[in-house]
């Protein structure tokens, strides 16, 4: 039996990719499309229900799983809608504030909700590998990260960089917010040992590149993940949607739960 998918932000780059895969892969079916009022008219003629909010489409798609790659304010509206209806929701949006994340955790007690800053399998394998590497190398190695994205990305550092940074900080027994440095300028003195640098580069149409540097006495180790297309993230989101069908409300699920 195929998993029915509602795509929120259907006119966006990720939305279009997810819609195409959901409509063409036998394991999935397209059950609804959602976009803002100024863009929803372009969805006219679709073979599934269309609306300018997830709340408007959910009653027409019982049992469907919504996938939302939009903006924090829109994704929160989607989460509130499924909390009221009982549908499941996969969120790939980044840039949430701490207060918004807290609300997601509360809403996840009422409906199955899955959130990840990066849906690629490779990045989530890195989250398992990097802590082991960090502990093996020890405190003699400084940790820095550089992330590259296209010139239309709105948040910085990327959600993926922050997720990887949290994995690295936890391995050192730190809280990322206490040790993160995202800008250096002027006479700032020596680099503190308890620090993880995360620098962002924006330009062109780069899908996403994250490189972690371990710099120690006389040597440097570089670990890089490079996304070649958005299909990587779309496939991961669809995989999460299929997995979420069998889950119950109670916690905000993530990639670690699925793996």
UniProtKB/Swiss-Prot annotation:
Catalytic activities: (S)-2,3,4,5-tetrahydrodipicolinate + NAD(+) + H2O = (2S,4S)-4-hydroxy-2,3,4,5-tetrahydrodipicolinate + NADH + H(+); (S)-2,3,4,5-tetrahydrodipicolinate + NADP(+) + H2O = (2S,4S)-4-hydroxy-2,3,4,5-tetrahydrodipicolinate + NADPH + H(+)
Ligand binding (NADP(+)): 37
CDD domains xref list: DHDPR_N
Gene3D superfamilies xrefs: Dihydrodipicolinate Reductase, domain 2, NAD(P)-binding Rossmann-like Domain
Keyword annotations of the record: Amino-acid biosynthesis, Cytoplasm, Diaminopimelate biosynthesis, Lysine biosynthesis, NAD, NADP, Oxidoreductase
The EC number(s) this enzyme carries: 1.17.1.8
Active site feature: 149 (proton donor/acceptor), 153 (proton donor)
Pathway as given in its UniProt record: Amino-acid biosynthesis; L-lysine biosynthesis via DAP pathway; (S)-tetrahydrodipicolinate from L-aspartate: step 4/4
Record-linked InterPro entries: DapB_C, DapB_N, DHDPR_bac, NAD(P)-bd_dom_sf
One term under GO cellular component: cytosol
EC supergroup of this enzyme: oxidoreductase
Record flagged with keyword Isomerase: no
Residues reported in the UniProt entry to bind (S)-2,3,4,5-tetrahydrodipicolinate: 150, 159-160
Residue sites binding NAD(+) per the record: 9-14, 92-94, 116-119
One annotated GO molecular function: NAD binding
Subcellular location: Cytoplasm
Biological process (GO), any one: lysine biosynthetic process via diaminopimelate
Protein task: Catalyzes the conversion of 4-hydroxy-tetrahydrodipicolinate (HTPA) to tetrahydrodipicolinate.
Family per record: Belongs to the DapB family.
Protein name (database record): 4-hydroxy-tetrahydrodipicolinate reductase
Record organism: Desulfovibrio desulfuricans (strain ATCC 27774 / DSM 6949 / MB)
Organism lineage: Bacteria, Pseudomonadati, Thermodesulfobacteriota, Desulfovibrionia, Desulfovibrionales
Gene: dapB
């Amino acid at each position: 039996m195929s998993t029915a998918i509602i795509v929120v932000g259907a006119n966006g780059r990720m939305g279009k990719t997810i819609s195409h895969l959901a409509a063409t892969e036998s394991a999935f079916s397209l059950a609804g499309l959602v976009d803002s009022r100024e863009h929803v008219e372009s969805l006219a003629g679709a073979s599934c229900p269309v609306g300018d909010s997830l709340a408007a489409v959910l009653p027409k798609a019982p049992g469907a799983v919504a996938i939302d790659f939009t903006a924090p304010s829109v994704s929160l509206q989607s989460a509130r809608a499924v909390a009221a209806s009982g549908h499941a929701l996969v969120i790939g949006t980044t840039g949430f504030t701490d207060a918004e994340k807290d609300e997601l955790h509360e809403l996840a007690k009422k409906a199955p909700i899955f959130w990840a800053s990066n849906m690629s399998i490779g990045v989530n394998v890195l989250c398992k590998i990097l802590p082991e590497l960090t502990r093996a190398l020890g405190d003699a190695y400084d940790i820095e990260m550089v992330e590259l994205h296209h010139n239309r990305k709105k948040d910085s550092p990327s959600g993926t960089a922050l997720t990887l940074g949290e994995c690295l900080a936890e391995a050192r027994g730190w809280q990322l917010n206490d040790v993160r440095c995202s800008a250096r300028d002027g006479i700032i003195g020596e680099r503190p040992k308890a620090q993880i640098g995360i620098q962002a580069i924006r330009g062109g149409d780069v899908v996403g590149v994250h490189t972690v540097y371990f710099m120690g006495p006389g040597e440097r180790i570089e670990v890089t993940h490079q996304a070649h297309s958005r299909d990587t993230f779309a496939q991961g989101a669809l995989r999460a949607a299929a997995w979420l069908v069998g889950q119950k409300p109670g916690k905000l699920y993530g990639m670690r739960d699925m793996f």
